[in-house]
Amino acid sequence: VYADVLARRLGCGVLVCDREHIVAAAGAGKNELLHRELPPELDRLLKKRRLYTAPANPDRRIRLGGRWLLCAAPILVHGDIEGGVLLPGSARDPLPEAEVIRAAATAAEFLARWMEE
């Protein structure tokens, strides 16, 4: 439900992952990506504990099935990585605007706080 609401508000697809799989999906590619195992590049990216925005060059973006990763915000619970909020897109999609990136980071922070409780 959270991914659905966030996707509607942001106007783009939203994925939520744990450390191994996509656990929630909304928007384009939802059925293809739900329950998919995380690619090793995404696992390494989340372990950096930083907000990620894809490079402008589509050839350098991380692939998620038939989609591309445009933004990733790690979910940090008590200092440990528990997953992330991901914004997928196509190779032709523009990079997300600053307010969309901030919303993904806020969503990850909210989920982290909720998991800490």
Whereabouts are the PLM-identified features?
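Structured interaction and signal-relay segments at domain junctions
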Residues: 1-64
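Juxtadomain coupling helices with adjacent low-complexity linkers
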Residues: 1-9, 37-44, 48-52, 84, ...
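Short amphipathic alpha-helical interaction segments
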Residues: 63, 67, 96-99
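A short beta-strand signature within small-molecule sensing/ligand-binding domains used
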Residues: 64-76
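Short hydrophobic/glycine-rich mini-motifs in sensory/regulatory modules
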Residues: 75-85
